[in-house]
A protein has these predicted regions:
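Radical SAM enzyme core and accessory elements
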Residues: 162, 170-203
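Gly/Ser/Thr-rich beta-alpha loop segments that engage phosphate groups in nucleotides
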Residues: 1-2, 38, 177, 185
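Generic structural signal for residues in well-ordered beta-strands
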Residues: 97, 168-170
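Conserved AdoMet/S-adenosylmethionine-binding subsite of the radical SAM
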Residues: 2-163
Length: 203
């Protein structure tokens, strides 16, 4: 979580944008991504760094979001939306909301409708990300997370676009066939390392 390392992250951003530095990257070309660290968002909104803000939202109601993103138990969706609105009001930059679509978990018609409602007062872009399945399915509590079918992805995207005035995009995920898409490779490597660690070593 970048905003838990606020000083280091903002120092790096300043070095990247420095006019006498080697990179000279403008603030409008840099984005800070967060899982929803509300105090960090508010602090960044007061900073002189005019960078973009991307928030991993991933659910439209607190019960589901708290299951898949424990940070929500501390800063629920209402607080997160208020912080995002504050960021826009102070910076004048659209916020990006990242939203992972999981079959029968976050891809319901009601989710599309709620997503349009909770973002209605915040100038933003909504980036839909189809879930990249792990094999076997990653299970948390009583839920197994799966990627929605193409038909369900299209239905959600279409419904959201019809319900909101915001820009809605859907990420084209690549590398799933070799478990190298977002979130997959790390899990495969971690599982392999765990298997090696559990193998008895010769005395």
């Amino acid at each position: 979580e970048p905003l838990l390392n606020y000083e280091q992250v903002t120092c790096a951003l300043r070095l990247a944008r420095a006019s006498d530095g080697q990179l000279q990257i403008g603030g409008r070309k840099m984005t800070v991504s967060t899982a929803g660290h509300v105090p960090g968002i508010l602090r960044l909104s007061e900073d002189d760094l005019n960078v973009g803000l991307a928030i991993s939202l991933n659910a439209t109601e607190d019960e589901t979001r708290s299951q898949i993103m424990p940070i929500n138990r501390k800063w629920p969706i209402a607080d997160l939306m208020a912080a995002a609105k504050t960021y826009f009001d102070r910076k004048g930059r659209r916020v990006t909301f990242e939203y992972v679509l999981m079959d029968q978990v976050t891809d319901l018609d009601a989710d599309a409708d709620r997503l349009a409602v909770i973002t209605s007062s915040i100038p933003c872009k909504i980036n839909l990300i189809p879930y990249n399945e792990l094999a076997p399915g990653l299970q948390m509590s009583d839920r197994v997370y799966r990627r929605p079918s193409s038909a369900r992805l299209d239905r959600f995207t279409r419904r959201l676009k019809n319900a909101t005035r915001h820009t809605v995009t859907r990420r084209d995920s690549r590398g799933r066939d070799i478990d190298a898409a977002c979130g997959q490779l790390h899990r495969r490597v971690t599982d392999a390392q765990s298997a090696v660690s559990a193998t008895p070593q010769p005395a």
